[in-house]
């Protein structure tokens, strides 16, 4: 039985990607906003040597992340493309990967989690999408949302290769 949330978000992701498929920038914006809103976390993409993110305000929904130190560490991660690329390389599998708490190797981020997957994206195989937020995030929403982005992008990219 498919959860009604799953049907709703899957449809929204598919429609957003299909609608915006002719513009890389618009697809990125659409994906980031949908994933961030639905997961209540910060959504990010890393494509080659560029990273972008959306939804920093979602971090304020989690009391355990209200410390300036934690927020600053998260912002530093999001703004450090090399760090993100290394994390993806180290922990990536064929599906959706989870890095929870201190597994990241970053002291003081025991309350955080990162969920990410590889993303087919036009002319590169070096792209990932993910979310970072509280380790209390709703993984039942985060994992399917990222799987659907990956699947929808793979389907859209079939026509481009």
Where are the language model's segments positioned?
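Intrinsically disordered, acidic Ser/Thr/Pro-rich low-complexity regulatory segments
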Residues: 2-161
């Amino acid at each position: 039985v498919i959860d009604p949330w799953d049907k709703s978000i899957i449809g929204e992701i598919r429609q957003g990607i299909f609608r915006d498929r002719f513009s890389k920038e618009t697809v990125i914006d659409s994906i980031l906003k949908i994933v961030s809103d639905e997961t209540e976390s910060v959504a990010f993409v890393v494509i080659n040597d560029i990273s972008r993110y959306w939804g920093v305000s979602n971090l304020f929904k989690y009391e355990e992340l209200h410390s300036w130190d934690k927020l600053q560490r998260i912002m530093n991660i999001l703004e450090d493309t090399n760090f993100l690329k290394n994390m993806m390389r180290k922990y990536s599998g064929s599906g959706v990967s989870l890095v929870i708490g201190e597994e990241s190797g970053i002291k003081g981020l025991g309350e955080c989690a990162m969920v990410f997957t590889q993303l087919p994206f036009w002319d590169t195989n070096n792209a990932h999408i993910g979310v970072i937020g509280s380790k209390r995030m709703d993984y039942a929403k985060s994992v399917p949302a990222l799987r659907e982005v990956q699947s929808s992008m793979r389907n859209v990219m079939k026509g481009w290769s």
